[in-house]
Amino acid sequence: MNGNDNLSTRAYLAIGMMLFALFFGAGNLIFPAALGQQAGSNVGWALFGFVLTGVGLPLLGVAAMGYSSCKDVEELASRVHPIYGLLYTISLYLSIGPMFATPRTGTVAYEIAIKPFTEGLSMNMEPIFLALFFGVSLWLSISPHKLVNRIGNILTPALLLVILLLIIKSFMTPLVGYAVPQPAYGDAPTAVLQGFLDGYNTMDALASVVFAILVIDFVRLSGATSHAVVTKTVMEVGAIAVALLGIVYVFIANIGATSVERFGLFDTGAPVLSVSANYLFGGFGQIILAIIVLLACLSTSIGLITSCGTYFHKLTPKISYKLYVVIFSVAAFGLSMFGLKTIISAAIPVLMLLYPLTIVIVLLALLHNVFGGRRCVYAWTMAFTMISALMTGLETAGIAPATLEQLFTQYIPFQAAGMGWVSFAVLGFIVGLIHKGLVSENK
């Protein structure tokens, strides 16, 4: 460490690769592959939208946490109101924790890495594997201070090496041509929009504001002290992580886009990867893919359990961190038994609610100094965003009141596409600025 408390190159890379590995889990494997299959020859346009939410927003999330000087997500969200901050943060952690994202890591690991090797057995191996998977996740989550060494220095290099092998082979043995796009990706504008919404499924923007706290802690432990250096370093290691994510997304989506004519369409991205790896490498391909999936899903599972345990222990200190880790690991195991397709379907309405709220709070954090950090601007913007996001979530779940749904779809720009929250957020921001101006004039 030198005198101006900058990190060493090794520390930069270790923390950057740790963050990549925390992001790169179940959804980052299956959703680009599924997007590629659906988008076909429009995969480039769909990827553009997907990268905005799957790469751009996570980077903004990490940057916002570093820039804001907030010690956690709740403190940032409490700029709206303390009660909102608490409820939003609990919802966020439960979604990326035991309810959806963490169980998904186990189910994807089983579907891709284990199931192809056990299909001939009379015994159902899924419960046994999931118990082992979350047992290992629990064990490795007990000591969070060892996360950089275990993931950044060990798991991530191994993961990247095996992914690189798959990418090189996909160039040497290309699949057939690009498929005809499905209707949702039929032209460039719709493909970009659908890709943007598909990026919600990775949950990386939600996780970014959580993982950023881990990164900030590790940056400080590595020797950085001043706020300026911590912010700069967090953004740089975030850039390393999302650049790696973007590169991998491009190649996985391309494999999906060129796999349809040979293998047909699949319900999820899991079998796309499985049959493609088998085609590229033969029987050995399934082993390579199994290693990628196990490493990716395990590292993400550890990061999510660690983050959730840390937050809830802080919220209720009388319950130990280790007990919370046990609770979340057991809960994730139980919910993972419902299967991958059920978990994905159940998560979508919640994501349609939480994603707009997260995007807007991140943007407000980055614009904090522009409007003087006034609470009225935060409150009005988030209140308006909540109206549309809640309606979209209800629509996606199929429980929205028919009259309201018709009104929103007819009069709110992009509401039918799940993007009506943009208009509401802008309107709320303007109202907040007017409120700020009126209050200032009356002083």
Residue ranges of predicted features:
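TM-loop-TM module centered on a large, flexible mid-protein loop between adjacent transmembrane helices
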Residues: 72-78, 248-298, 305, 349
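A generic transmembrane alpha-helix motif of multi-pass inner-membrane proteins
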Residues: 173, 374-443
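Hydrophobic, small-residue-rich membrane helices and short re-entrant helix-turn-helix hairpins
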Residues: 143-154, 192-195, 215-244, 261-274, ...
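Hydrophobic alpha-helical segments and their helix-loop junctions in multi-pass secondary transporters
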Residues: 98, 102, 160-187, 205-206, ...
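Selective recognition of specific alpha-helical transmembrane segments in multi-pass small-molecule
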Residues: 56, 60, 158-170, 234-260, ...
